[in-house]
């Protein structure tokens, strides 16, 4: 698994996820977002938390896929699949802290993706960005996220 910067090819995933009204109660989203809005966001984000005051990364999962259905699994190549996104937001450079949030695609839930993504983001945030604190604000109804963050030591 890896975290990477958003690319224009991620627009279909972001459009689907941001407009999933069932998730709005667990986020600050109150209205649908257009493809144009999301395209502008992708075009304007620098990937620099100091400039944007937030950092959104795409969660990619590596998987082996056969080159040809006739070939054995020995002849395979590594492919990636987008399975979610994870954010640092409400960045406070002076106090070196930020909030964390994530979205895991329904087909990837319950497989440890969220926990692994949080660990990767923490490693980057504490090791490279030198943050002192990452905090999570979670809806009481979002038991899946509450469970992940509790396992990771968030209280």
Segment roles from a protein language model:
Residues 28, 52-56, 132:
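Short, polar/charged, Gly/Pro-enriched helix-capping and turn/loop motifs at alpha-helix termini
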Residues 1-2, 6-11, 18-20, 80-155:
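Acyl-donor (CoA/ACP) binding surface of acyl/acetyltransferases
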Residues 1, 16-33, 48:
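Helix-loop element at the rim of GNAT/NAT acetyltransferase active sites that forms part
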Residues 1-12, 24-25, 69-75:
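Conserved N-terminal entry element of GNAT/NAT acetyltransferase domains
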Residues 33-68, 72-109:
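Acetyl-CoA-dependent GNAT
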Residues 29, 39-44, 49, 114, ...:
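Alpha-helix boundary/capping detector
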Residues 14-19, 38-42:
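Hydrophobic alpha-helical core bundles mediating ligand binding, dimerization, or RNAP-core interactions
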């Amino acid at each position: 698994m890896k975290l990477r910067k958003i690319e224009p090819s991620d627009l279909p995933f972001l459009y689907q996820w941001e407009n999933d009204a069932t998730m709005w109660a667990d986020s600050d989203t109150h209205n649908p977002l257009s493809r144009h809005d999301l395209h502008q966001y992708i075009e304007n984000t620098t990937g620099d938390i100091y400039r944007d005051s937030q950092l959104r990364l795409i969660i990619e999962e590596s998987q082996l896929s056969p080159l040809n259905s006739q070939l054995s699994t020995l002849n395979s190549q590594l492919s990636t699949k987008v399975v979610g996104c994870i954010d640092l937001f409400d960045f406070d450079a002076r106090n070196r802290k930020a909030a964390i949030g994530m979205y895991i695609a329904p087909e990837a839930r319950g497989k440890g993706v969220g926990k692994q993504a949080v660990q990767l983001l923490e490693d980057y945030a504490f090791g490279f960005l030198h943050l002192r604190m990452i905090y999570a604000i979670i809806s009481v109804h979002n038991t899946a996220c509450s469970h992940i963050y509790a396992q990771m030591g968030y209280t």
